[in-house]
């Protein structure tokens, strides 16, 4: 299973959307400063995950979550929860 995830910066409330086979391992990479964008906003915490059976479906969801419609959906999702 491949997971799409959303991270929230504890420092400045920035968000980051990505996908990985092992989300916890990927979170450690983000929090160790190995990614240029996420390094500036460390530390991060996982706020949303969703699993899919293949990379293509996961990539489509990631692309959606990065779109304006997806950002609006995430905002509504977290306003409810």
Predicted regions and their residues:
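GIY-YIG nuclease catalytic motif and its immediate N-terminal context
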Residues: 1-35, 40-81
């Amino acid at each position: 299973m491949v997971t799409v995830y959303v991270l929230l910066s504890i420092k400045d409330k920035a968000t980051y959307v990505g996908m990985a086979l092992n989300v916890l391992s990927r979170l450690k990479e983000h929090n160790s400063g190995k990614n240029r964008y996420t390094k500036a906003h460390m530390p991060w915490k996982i706020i949303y995950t969703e699993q899919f059976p293949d990379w293509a479906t996961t990539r489509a969801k990631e692309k959606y979550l990065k779109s304006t419609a997806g950002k609006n959906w995430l905002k509504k999702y977290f306003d409810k929860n």
